[in-house]
Each structure stands twice: as structure tokens, then as C-alpha cells.
Amino acid sequence: MKTCCFAGHRKITDDIEIIKIKLKKGIIDLIENHNVTTFYNGGKGDFDWLCAYTVDELKKDYPFISSHLVLSYMPTYKYANNLKSFDTTIYPEMEKTPPKFAIIKRNQWMIDNSKFLIAYVKQSLDSGAYKALSYAQKKNMTIINISI
């Protein structure tokens, strides 16, 4: 089982249709050419939800793939309506992590437990998405950055 995670800015500022095409192409390539079957998603912004819906849509053609929501905080009602896009939720051991750092820690967990990263990250040094991308680069992870 090979795993891919996603990291991206909360707001998509580029042409959404181009991002959708690149995202779907990247996911299909990982499934067909790299045997990726598991996808981790943080569920925290436009890009994460686009990834969730895309993986969910691709399950029709690839019923063996799975999608998992990796929580940075204990679940709230906000997630209840959106869980149908995921097979499971995962809450890594982060109870002692201050809330300010929970998303960073969650992103690191997803990267540490994945072989591939599909990113939508621009050069915004102070963003969590950029920090996740930098962390993945330091781990020599295979990265597909679909930002325009």
C-alpha cells in the first residue's frame, strides 16, 4: 500500500478548472503508475476539499482506493456533513500539541506517513502550506506541485 497526502493553500487563487485538471491527472498517475491506494487529507480549505471530492469521484473507476480525513483537532459538528467523502477519520496523537501548532503537526504526520505529496503551494513563506511543502522537501518526498 502506497500513500499520498495533500497540502495546499486554503484559498485557490488560480483558475479552478486548470487546478482540477492537474489534480485529477496527478492522482490518476499515482494510482495507475505508482500503485497509490491511500490518500490522506487535512480537510481545512478549498484545496483540501477539492482533493477530497476528486478522490471520491475517482473511486467509481478505482474502487480499491481509500480516502482518510486526518484531523488536527477533535472533530466538531462542522465536519459531520462532509465526512461522506472519506472512508475514515484519523486523529494522530496530538492532545499535548498547542492548538496554534496542531495543523502544522497534523501536516507533518501526513507527510511522515506518505510516500507522495500533491501540493498547491506558491512561494508564501509564512503559510502552513509552504511549511508543509518545505518539510516534505527535507524528507526527500516525491512531490507534485500543481500550482500555476
List the predicted regions and their residue ranges.
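Acidic/glycine-enriched connector segments
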Residues: M1-I148
